[in-house]
Structure formats: C-alpha cells, structure tokens
Design a protein with these regions (language model features):
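Alpha-helical scaffolding segments of alpha/beta enzyme cores, especially the outer helices
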Residues: 31-41, 45, 74-78
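N-terminal/domain-start segments enriched in small and hydrophobic, helix-friendly residues
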Residues: 37-53, 63-67
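Structured catalytic/translocation cores of nucleotide/phosphate-coupled proteins
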Residues: 5-8, 32-40, 51, 117-124, ...
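Alpha-helix N-cap and loop-to-helix initiation/capping positions
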Residues: 23-31, 35, 63-71
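Surface-exposed acidic, glycine-flexible loop patches that form ligand/cofactor-binding
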Residues: 1-2, 41-42, 46, 133-134
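Oxyanion-hole/transition-state-stabilizing segment in secreted/luminal serine hydrolases
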Residues: 1-30
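Catalytic His-Asp segment of secreted/periplasmic serine-dependent ester chemistry enzymes
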Residues: 16-18, 55-134
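Structural recognition of the beta-strand scaffold that forms the well-ordered cores
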Residues: 4-10, 48-54, 87-90, 115
C-alpha cells in the first residue's frame, strides 16, 4: 500500500534454469515478454508507474548458453522499446563488457559471472535516473 513506482527486473533465471527443464517447461522470448507485460499491466492497474530494467549479461555462469543469450537479447530489445512503461533503466548497457557483450565487465562481475559485485551494483544504481522516480 502506498507504492507509487516500481522497478521490475525479470527473466534471467527463467532463461538459465532451462538447462534443467523439459522441453515443455522451457520459456521462449515470447513467454518472458508476455510475463513481463502481465506484471506491468497488473502494476499499472493499481496506479503504479512502472520502470523496467534490461537483463544483465551472464556468460561465464554455469547456466549460460547461446540460445539463452539469444532470448536475453530478444527480451532486452523489447524492453528497450517498450512504450507501456514509464521508463527503462538499461542495466545491460551499464555493466556489459564492450569487447564481449554477453559477459559482465570484469570490474563489475561477481564470482559466479551472473551476479554483480559491489562495484557492479553501484554502477547499476548510478544508471538509474532518480528524477524519474520523484
């Protein structure tokens, strides 16, 4: 109660855990987009301004795969062009390695290559335009 804004970051575990799922359980880019759109619609129906974040890279993590990276890219492209939300914070652009965009830049990468380290979390925090949340 009382929330006016929400920042949604969704999808990376749905991509990664597919290695353990049966073919019928695997999420496609369209599945993830539909799930995110549903969450956005639910929040907006409650009068909440919604902001999305792009999914950060995860190459080097045990559940990285090329098909999973393709899904991440497709969903991120949709997020970046989404007109149903109040804004987008591009965490992918903030922390990716320019030489290898499927990987988090070493300075920001946690030990598992999926999560950020303290400097990485600081970097994504700095990439949020706080004026949009006022």
């Amino acid at each position: 109660a009382g929330a006016t804004h929400a920042i949604l970051q969704m999808g990376i575990n749905d991509i990664g855990f597919q290695l353990a799922w049966t073919p019928n359980e695997k999420a496609t880019a369209a599945d993830l987009i539909n799930s995110i759109a549903s969450a956005v619609a639910a929040a907006k129906a409650m009068g909440i301004q919604v902001y999305l974040t792009t999914m950060t890279p995860f190459k080097g993590h045990v559940y990285f795969s090329d098909p999973g990276e393709q899904i991440r890219q497709e969903v991120n492209a949709w997020i970046r062009t989404n007109t149903e939300v109040s804004g987008v914070f591009d965490f992918d652009a903030a922390v990716r390695d320019p030489a290898e965009p499927a990987r988090i830049l070493a300075a920001y990468r946690g030990a598992d290559s999926l999560h950020l380290n303290d400097l990485g979390y600081l970097r994504v925090t700095e990439s949020i335009d706080l004026d949009k949340l006022r």
